[in-house]
Amino acid sequence: MDIQEEYMPFRAYQTYYRVVGDLRSPLTPLLLLHGGPGSTHNYFEAFDQLAMATGRPIVMYDQLGCGRSSIPTDPHLWQAATWVAELRALRAYLKLDCVHLLGQSWGGMLALIYLCDDQPRGIQSVILASTLSSAHLWAREQHRLIQFMSTTDQAAIHQAEMTGDFTTPAYLAANERFMIQHATGPITEQTPEFLRRSKRLGTAAYTTAWGPNEYFPTGTLRDYDYTAKLAQLPYPTLVTSGVNDLCTPLVAKTMVDQLPHAEWTLFPHSRHMAFIDEPAAYQARLTQWLAAHDEVTDD
C-alpha cells in the first residue's frame, strides 16, 4: 500500500498530510480530522489497516499548530475559523471533491462547524467519533464522571479549578487517572508504535482554544454549541462512542436525537478512541458504513 507524505502551503505556513492508498481509486476517500486541538494525526495510523483491507484511500493530516505542520506563535490563530479554512484548503489542494468525513473528539467539532456553517458539497457521509455538539454539556458530563473518582482526586481537581493552578502533583496525578479511565493509555511496550512514537503536541493550540484539560473549557471554543444546528444536516451520519468514553452516552445521544439521518454504534469495551480499544470491531463497523454510503451523491 502506497503512503504519500507531503506538505500543503497554507497562508504563510505548511500543513503536513499523509495519504494512504491511491486517490484515483473508485472508492470514495476517507478524510480524517484529529482531536485536540493539537493531538496530531498519529493515532489515525490505526486506519492504515482499513485502507490495506479494502483499497479505500485515506487522508489524514496534522492541523496547523501541531505535529509535522507549522507551529506558529500567534495565539490569535487558535480558533475554529483557522482550522476550518485549513480544511477547505486541503480539500481543494488534493481535489477531494467527494469524501467521507470522520472527525474524532475536537475533529468532530471541526467537522460539525464546517458542515453546518459551510454546507459543503461532496460529503458522502459523516462519522462523528467520540465528539460533542455542546461544550457546556461536555463539561457538565465530565464533572459528573469526576464524582466517581476518589475524594482525594476530586479535591485536587476542584482545587485546581478554583485557583487556576493546574501544575500541582496532586492535580496532575488525578488528571492522569481520569484520562486513563476515560480516554487513553497507559503506554506500554505492547502499545502500537504509532502511539509510542514521539510527536510535537500542539499545547498552545489546545490551551488557547479549549483549556487546561478536558473538563474545564476556558478557551476560544468554550461557548461552542451546535446542537440546535444539527437538524439541518442532510448527510448520513454515524456516531460512534465507547461505554467509558469522555463522550458519554448522553453526549452522544444528544447529537443522535438531533441529526435527521443518524445511526449510533456504542462500543462496550472502549474509551475515547474506540478504534484503538476495539480495533477489529471498529474497522468492521466503519467498513460496513462506508461501503453502504459510497453510492450516495451530492446532487
From Swiss-Prot:
The entry's localization annotation reads: Cell envelope
E.C. no: 3.4.11.5
Give, as one word, the top-level EC class.
hydrolase
InterPro entries membership = AB_hydrolase_1, AB_hydrolase_fold, AB_hydrolase_sf, Peptidase_S33, Pro_imino_pep
Ordered alphabetically, the record's keywords are: Aminopeptidase, Hydrolase, Protease
Q: Does the keyword Magnesium apply?
A: no
Query: Where would I find the AB hydrolase-1 domain in this sequence?
Result: 29-279
Catalyzed reactions: Release of N-terminal proline from a peptide
A family per Pfam: Abhydrolase_1
Which Gene3D superfamilies has this protein been placed in? alpha/beta hydrolase
What would be one Gene Ontology cellular-component term for the protein? membrane
What is one Gene Ontology biological process annotated in the Swiss-Prot or TrEMBL record?
proteolysis
Q: Show the active-site residues.
A: S105, D245, H272
User: What is the superkingdom listed in this entry's lineage?
Assistant: Bacteria
Q: Which GO terms describe its molecular function?
A: aminopeptidase activity
Biological role: Releases the N-terminal proline from various substrates.
- What family is this protein classified in? Belongs to the peptidase S33 family.
Q: What is this protein called?
A: Proline iminopeptidase
The organism's taxonomy opens as: Bacteria, Bacillati, Bacillota, Bacilli, Lactobacillales
